[in-house]
Swiss-Prot record:
Specifically methylates guanosine-37 in various tRNAs. Keywords: Cytoplasm, Methyltransferase, S-adenosyl-L-methionine, Transferase, tRNA processing. Belongs to the RNA methyltransferase TrmD family. It comes from Photorhabdus laumondii subsp. laumondii (strain DSM 15139 / CIP 105565 / TT01). The lineage of its organism: Bacteria, Pseudomonadati, Pseudomonadota, Gammaproteobacteria, Enterobacterales. It catalyses: guanosine(37) in tRNA + S-adenosyl-L-methionine = N(1)-methylguanosine(37) in tRNA + S-adenosyl-L-homocysteine + H(+). It is an enzyme of class 2 (transferase). One of its GO terms (molecular function) is tRNA (guanine(37)-N1)-methyltransferase activity. One of its GO terms (cellular component) is cytosol. This is tRNA (guanine-N(1)-)-methyltransferase. The gene is trmD. One of its GO terms (biological process) is tRNA N1-guanine methylation.
Length: 250
């Protein structure tokens, strides 16, 4: 997968290219990330990249000319078929379904805004989609872009040691993940659930699904509203709810 990034702070993306899962993906040639800095497309000695908005008001906007030239340079490098995304609070909120959709693209260009944003006409003429990572304000689009790169790259074949890791993540099937345990078997008096030590994989999978359904019901019940649960899942959820109620009243 190839990802182009337009950012005034390309150095920030070393966190993605040099470390962790994404760093290994880059090293192994599974993921390629290239950055363009709009400052490199300025023609004044101050390398100006911001300008005042028409109509007044606080703050500045990213200057059109260097931003557009950076976008065009990225598009040229990408060739045909690259989807251009602007990370914006006004965009579609990123969730696991959206990540899966984005992961089907071979090429993405991510535009990281700064200041008060970018000229609306640039959005209309250069941007294919706007995406947001949540209803809160950040100083720029770099962290949202890194979030998107990290989540999307997990679906590139070969990036994870076990592809099942991506398939079993929280939200992969619309549910939160189940609890996980490792050694020691007893920690401060708290024991690992016996079923996980049983070696019975059918029972382990059943327990994990029940915990996943129950955790979603407790923490993110709205997620269940959009899911078509199987008969088995309904039974497991009812079991969890009954057990939870019993524990709460004891």
């Amino acid at each position: 997968m190839w990802i182009g990034v337009i950012s005034l702070f390309p150095e920030m993306f070393r966190a993605i290219t040099d470390y962790g899962v994404t760093g290994r993906a880059v090293k192994n040639g599974l993921l390629s990330i290239e950055c363009w800095n709009p400052r490199d497309f300025t023609y004044d000695r101050h390398r100006t990249v911001d300008d005042r908005p028409y109509g007044g008001g606080p703050g500045m906007l990213m200057m059109v000319q260097p931003l557009r030239e950076a976008i065009h340079a990225a598009k040229t490098a990408a060739g045909e078929g690259a989807k251009v995304i602007y990370l914006s609070p006004q965009g579609r909120k990123l969730n696991q379904q959206g990540v899966c959709e984005l992961a089907t693209n071979e090429k993405l260009i991510l535009i990281c805004g700064r200041y008060e944003g970018i000229d609306e006409r640039v959005i209309q003429t250069e941007i294919d989609e706007e995406w947001s990572i949540g209803d809160y304000v950040l100083s720029g689009g770099e962290i949202p872009a890194m979030t998107m790169i990290d989540s999307v790259s997990r679906f590139i074949p070969g990036v994870l040691g076990h592809q099942a890791s991506a398939e079993e993540d929280s939200f992969a099937d619309g549910l939160l993940d189940c609890p996980h345990y490792t050694r020691p078997e007893v920690l401060d008096g708290m024991e690992v659930p016996p079923v996980l030590l049983s070696g019975n994989h059918a029972e382990i999978n059943r327990w994990r699904m029940k915990q996943s359904l129950g955790r979603t019901w407790l923490r993110r019940p709205e997620l269940l509203e959009n899911l078509a649960l199987t008969d088995e899942q309904r039974i497991l959820l009812t079991e969890f709810q009954r057990e939870h109620l019993t524990e709460a009243t004891n």
